[in-house]
């Protein structure tokens, strides 16, 4: 006997949260809970404004239609990426095919005063890997901050993300302020320039390795080994089903590329599932999941060690 619930939710965000030049005041999304006999599985559907092609309102229509079909015995996955991902997670939990083991290690997202960051990062146990958003301020300032962090902490490796913010000139301005002796400790810089060709040129000219992120979701993208390209950053909410995520990880690994499972600012429920996916598909790589602190609450499932209050499913708005 099958049954299902769909919940709609909204979480207040930190006041300073800006995405693609827009302030994100709340994170909006949906949960689906599927039950069959004694088993149940949960999934999160939370399109990311400015990044997902679909809105959560559009996702809600597709999700409710899919759930009704599933209740009637038809389980074919929808095409819409956020719905395909959430539904496939719920089905995987239902079938017990999503391993429970999770990788809760985080590459902390660094912002704020560099002196405070140095103290925080110096105290990090184990492998020191952190993420810095660049491209939000002047490229010269970004270069100086990155150089300062690498100089102060000799065993630190940084993942940088420019979200295609730079022209070739700005990329050169950034690199000019990063000591060539430190550049090998930039694990990768995600999508430095507005075009892939400009990003490739940046890698060749600076010796700073790059990673593809947005490019993975473009129709002309192909997985190929390229000089200067070290990694791909996979955001499952923007990618689609678990199977598609696994195919992309396998394609990257076959080329010797690092594959990083990364957050699209999901709630704690979605983040704990991403931590399980990371442990399963990319066990040797620290995932990019340090986004929970951008929110003011957790929901349904806790992220280990988070002090944020937990909201239970029974107080969420139930649509089905």
Curated annotation (Swiss-Prot):
Entry's EC annotation: 4.2.1.113
Gene Ontology molecular function terms on file: magnesium ion binding; O-succinylbenzoate synthase activity
One Gene Ontology biological process: menaquinone biosynthetic process
InterPro entries membership: Enolase-like_C_sf (IPR036849), Enolase-like_N (IPR029017), Enolase_C-like (IPR029065), Mandelate_racemase_C (IPR013342), OSB_synthase_MenC1 (IPR010196), OSBS_N (IPR041338)
Keywords from the named record: Lyase, Magnesium, Menaquinone biosynthesis, Metal-binding
Residues annotated for Mg(2+) binding in this entry: 161, 190, 213
HAMAP family per UniProt: MenC_1
Entry similarity comment: Belongs to the mandelate racemase/muconate lactonizing enzyme family. MenC type 1 subfamily.
Function (record text): Converts 2-succinyl-6-hydroxy-2,4-cyclohexadiene-1-carboxylate (SHCHC) to 2-succinylbenzoate (OSB).
Protein name (Swiss-Prot/TrEMBL): o-succinylbenzoate synthase
């Amino acid at each position: 006997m099958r049954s299902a619930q769909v919940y709609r939710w909204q979480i207040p965000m930190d006041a300073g949260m800006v995405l693609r030049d827009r302030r994100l005041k709340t994170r909006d999304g949906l949960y689906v809970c599927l039950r069959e006999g004694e088993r149940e599985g949960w999934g999160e559907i939370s399109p990311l404004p400015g990044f997902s092609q679909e809105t959560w309102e559009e996702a809600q229509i597709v999700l409710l239609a899919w759930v009704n079909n599933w209740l009637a015995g038809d389980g074919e996955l929808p095409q819409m990426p956020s719905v395909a991902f959430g539904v496939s997670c719920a089905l995987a939990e239902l079938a017990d095919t999503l391993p429970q083991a999770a990788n809760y290690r985080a590459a902390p997202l660094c912002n704020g005063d560099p002196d405070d960051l140095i103290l925080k990062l110096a105290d990090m146990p184990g492998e020191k890997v952190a993420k810095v958003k660049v491209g939000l301020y002047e490229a010269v300032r970004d270069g100086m901050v990155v150089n300062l962090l690498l100089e102060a902490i000799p065993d630190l490796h940084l993942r940088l993300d420019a979200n295609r913010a730079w022209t070739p000139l700005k990329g050169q301005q950034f690199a000019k302020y990063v000591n060539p002796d430190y550049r090998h400790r930039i694990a990768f810089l995600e999508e430095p320039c507005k075009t892939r060709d400009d990003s490739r040129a940046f890698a060749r000219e600076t010796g700073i390795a790059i990673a593809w992120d947005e490019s993975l979701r473009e129709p002309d993208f192909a997985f190929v080994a390229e000089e200067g390209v070290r990694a791909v950053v996979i955001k499952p909410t923007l990618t689609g089903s678990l199977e598609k995520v696994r195919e992309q990880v396998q394609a990257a690994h076959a080329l010797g590329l690092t594959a990083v499972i990364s957050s699209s600012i999901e709630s704690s429920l979605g983040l704990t599932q991403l931590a399980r996916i990371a442990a399963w598909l990319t066990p040797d790589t620290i995932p990019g999941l340090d986004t929970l602190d951008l929110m003011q609450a957790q929901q349904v499932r806790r992220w280990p060690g988070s002090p944020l209050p937990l909201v239970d499913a029974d107080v969420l708005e139930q649509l089905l």
